[in-house]
Structure formats: structure tokens, C-alpha cells
Amino acid sequence: MEKNSSVDSLDISLLARPFRNPNYKAQPRRNRNLRQIIQNDPVQNEPSKFSYSSIEAPPSVLPQPKYCDVTGLLAIYTDPKTRLRYHNKEIYGLIRELPSGADQEYLKLRSSDVVLK
């Protein structure tokens, strides 16, 4: 019996919890679908305000991210000769070894190629 009483004294689930209200009953949660949320949206009557459901938003003040033309990763650098964007020195070595005209094909994919007449 000694072992059982010592185990009971260490069991924290048997201790009184003065911080909990024994008479508390949780309110039932009411799940609503998207249609109900949109109907109850008070901003719908005011088109000048932006809300979760409005698709119009002001333009971003952050600069547009630039991506590497070869890998698609974030481009930190730009080659001054070919104007191709690249991610690191390995890609730069690949860009320097491109045959003539291949750089224009990469720029054409990005829609910033130069058409000479």
C-alpha cells in the first residue's frame, strides 16, 4: 500500500484545480459556410473599403521580385552584358558559356528581348 499512496501523491490529475470554474459550460460553436460569411460582410455596401472578399486591392508598395532566368530562383544579380538575371556564380558561369543568340531566347521568355530592325 505504501507504493500506491506514493504514486497517488505524485499524480497531478488528482490535484484540485482552483483556477478552473467547475460550473463553466463551453458555448457550442457554430460553423458558417462562405456564402453566409459574404452575406454578413458589412463592407459590401461600401465599395471603397477593402475586405477579405473583395478582389480589388491597391498596388503593392513592395518591389516586384526578380527571378533567375535559368533556374527560377530569386535573382540577386544581373549580367551587365546579356542583361540576364542569375542566382549565384554557378549560373553566371553557365550564362557566360551560352552560345550567341541563346541569351536573347532567355530574354524573350521574360518578354524583355530587344528586336533589332
Swiss-Prot record:
UniProt KW Nucleus keyword: yes
Localization per Swiss-Prot or TrEMBL: Nucleus
Residue pairs linked by disulfide bridges in the UniProt entry: none
InterPro entries assigned: INO80C/Ies6, Vps72/YL1_C
The entry's keywords: Nucleus, Transcription, Transcription regulation
Coiled coil segments of this chain: none
Main location: nucleus
GO biological process: CENP-A containing chromatin assembly; chromatin remodeling; DNA repair-dependent chromatin remodeling; transcription initiation-coupled chromatin remodeling
This protein's GO CC annotations: chromatin; cytoplasm; Ino80 complex
Keyword Transmembrane attached: no
Job of this protein: Probably involved in transcription regulation via its interaction with the INO80 complex, a chromatin remodeling complex. Also involved in the regulation of telomere length.
Family assignment from sequence similarity: Belongs to the IES6 family.
Self-association state and partner proteins as the record states: Component of the chromatin-remodeling INO80 complex.
Protein name as annotated: Chromatin-remodeling complex subunit ies6
The gene coding this protein: ies6
